[in-house]
Every structure is written in structure tokens, then in C-alpha cells.
Amino acid sequence: MSTGPLLIIWHSRTGTSEQLAQAAHQPAGADSRLLRAEEVEPEDLLAAGGYLFCCPENLASMSGEMKEMFDRCYYPVLGKIEGRPYATVIAAGSDGEGAQRQIDRIATGWRLKRVTDRWIVNTEAQEAEAILAPKTVEPEALDRARDLGTALAEGIAQGIF
């Protein structure tokens, strides 16, 4: 059983991942913490009962800031967070599978337990101007993010995971 709040770790360049992370955090309230990837320290991961990783896919890979967080924190928490639940939200202009695979491989190394289906939010941005432009997330996706945050936080708090 996990203890501690849901830790929502995010990075965003154009707003999609940030909006989704904030939406997931909003209903979870005191049962969650929202931290930008650059702010996360190993102690934050150790204190959390589970994780929601929200980031964009950039050039078929997770964003550099999210990768840097994993690089900084991987070994200090290795062997100390096994079995904790996690979920992901990937923002992508097309498929998002590269970023998803990278995070899943890291989570496997940490022996985390995926507790939701993979979720990739496709912005369909294909041209440079559209890719770089600020994004507004559709209300349906924000609702789904709120539901995800609520379910994860409640599952952790109730010892379901």
C-alpha cells in the first residue's frame, strides 16, 4: 500500500501538458502535489504515494526537462519506491509513443505499477508554426484529466493501489 499524496510532475512548452496537469491536480486538492519537473527532488518522489507524469513528446522523445528530472532522481530513489502506482499523460502532435515508451521503461526500472491505460493527447500539430504555438486543451480532455487526478489521489488515499 502506498502512503503520501499523488505527485503530479509536469513539463510543458506550449501549454498542453501544463493544463492537463493542473486539471488533474485541481479536484485532488490536498491529496496531491503539483510540481514542474525541474523542481522535483528525490525527496519529493520518496514522500509521494504515487505519480502522474505529464509531458510533451518532442522529436519522438519525452521532453528534455522531464528526462533531466528522471536522470537526477533515478538512482537516489532506486529500490525505495517499488510498487507505487503511476500513470502518464503525453501531449503529442502525432503519436506520442516514443515518450510513452521512455517513461514506461524508467517506471519498469523503478518497479512502479501502472494503474491506468496509457493516455496520449494528440494536438494534431504538424507544421512548425502550429507545433510552437500556445495550445488550448479541449474541455473533454480537461474533464478526463480531472477524473484521472481524482481517481489516482483517491486510490492512493484509500490504499486501493
Task: Name every feature range the model reports, one short phrase each.
Residues 30-40:
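A short, well-structured beta->alpha microelement
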Residues 1-3, 81-82:
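Short, flexible coil/linker segments at domain boundaries that flank nucleotide/cofactor-interacting
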Residues 21-31, 108-113:
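Short helix-loop-beta junction
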Residues 2, 117-161:
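Glycine-rich phosphate/pyrophosphate-binding loop and the adjoining helix
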Residues 5, 31, 85:
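Residues at the starts of beta-strands that form the adenosine-phosphate
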Residues 20-28, 103, 148, 152:
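Hydrophobic residues within alpha-helices
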Residues 38-122:
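Helix-loop-strand module that forms the ligand-binding subsite of alpha/beta enzymes
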Residues 2-28:
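N-terminal beta1-alpha1 ligand-phosphate binding loop
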